[in-house]
Amino acid sequence: MRIYIYFFLLLFLLPACSGKPENIFELLKDDGLSDEEKLELIFEDKYLENIGFDKLEVNWLKSVYNIRNNKPLFCEDTIFTTIGRNSFESLCHPLAFGIPEIRLKNNAHPKFSNLLQEIYMCVNTGRIMHDLNNGFIDYNTKQKKSNQLITPAVFVENMDKLNSISLDQLFLKQGPSDTNYRYLAINLYNFYKKHPLDTTSFDLKNIDKEPINTSSRLSKAMISKGYLMAKNLSNQKVLEGLKEFQKDNGLSPDGIINTNTIIALNESNYKKVERAAISLDKIRQSKIHQEKYVRINIPEYLLYYYSNYRLISVNRIVVGKTTNQTPELTSKITRIVAYPFWKVPASICKKEALPAIKKNISYLSRNHYKIFKENNEEVDPSKVNWESLKKFPYSLIQEPGRHNSLGVIKFEFANSFSVYVHDTPSKGLFNKAVRNFSHGCMRCENPVELGKLILENDKIGNKANRMTPDSLDEMITAEKNRSIFLKVKIPIYVYYQTVVADRDNIVFHPDIYARDEEYLKLLHNKAK
């Protein structure tokens, strides 16, 4: 409706000196002309420019209809065909295919002639198909991409397929063949069709103190989001709906209302679907196509290791807190380090270590820390006037051992953020659904097993790394600081995609760092 109103107002705001904008409507009302004749005449003057089409769009339309000898795509004798009616419905729901509504040209008013509707439908279909294959955000510059159209020849070729498949199906076939993209595209479409696209943000403060029953605020929110039917409600169905909702939002499906569940309930389905559109857009522009690589999706809390184009291992991870966010990066894993030293980042030294030392100097010995000057000379902490310090002027190094914050193994790759993938003494955190607890590094579950798999596949042709999985086991047993350099450096991609899917399910993970929010503001022209 917003699109229709905008366009309707546009017609009245056109300046009188812009020609005769009403002529296109006079032309389209002429019953003495065939659709083909009307289309031919439309392109002979500036009828379309006068109602908001730019020259590129007009030239594109001319080319499209020239290929078709001015035969309409969606109309016959000025009446929508079945294909036309179904396609019009498809274009009313671009978010079902992962394309934000703002990417479409303002649609003609429903009362306008079907032939004019067709012209708008062609442009919007061309825009959608271009975005589905090329993306709508430039993630390097963090700017919206300009609206573009697929080539007229490719457009007509695709439109010919509408005799055998629907426009919905045609849109779903666009984009990369990547399995993750295919699963997300299909499951987003299914979610869109199954759940009402509510725009309501619920204020569910203190809802965790209310009983879970049919009259609760929870049940009203669940009905609005399509997880409950208003008829035949029962307390059991409310609980079952809550568990399904939690599962779809990357939370533990335990029926317990905690902070993360409340945050997910407060978010509207409309916003979740918009986040899914951004996730699809990121996948379609991804450059991950190597034979061997590691990818880490921060909001999903998972590490994926691939070798020989096959998924070898999936490991749960812990990522950085909101105040110590894990960065997105691309690098190459060069070595595996057993029993690593940990050089504590300067920010942690200042914010955490220095106050703890001032409180009790035994903090250093209890945590196996040593202090060094810039020339690597060790400092006796008992001879430092800690109370007088406002900054931490030394290097703080934690000695290797199972007590070490990096655990017994780390995977090293060059980056400007001083982050790694590593083990952790805090194994219990892997059992949580939302796992943002670190200082920015990525803590990995079962990292030794991951290291052994990497070494098992570390070869150039038939020449394998002389250090084997058994070698790593021996190093761990010896509890000595040792390094294994990889024969083949492994590309690693750390990225941020909040919405994911497998074959059967879509999951809307929390936008823990509000990075999707930044792109949503950009799409709605609210970016600073």
Which residues does each predicted region cover?
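C-terminal motif of bacterial Sec signal peptides marking the signal peptidase cleavage site
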Residues: L14-A16
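Cationic-aromatic interfacial patches
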Residues: S18-V156
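Well-ordered beta-sheet/strand-loop patches within structured domains
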Residues: S18-F53, S146, L172-S252, T259-K528
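Residue-level signal for mature regions of secreted extracellular proteins and peptides
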Residues: L10-L11, V434
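Short loop/turn hinge sites at secondary-structure boundaries
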Residues: G98-I99, N107-P110, D131, G135-Y139, ...
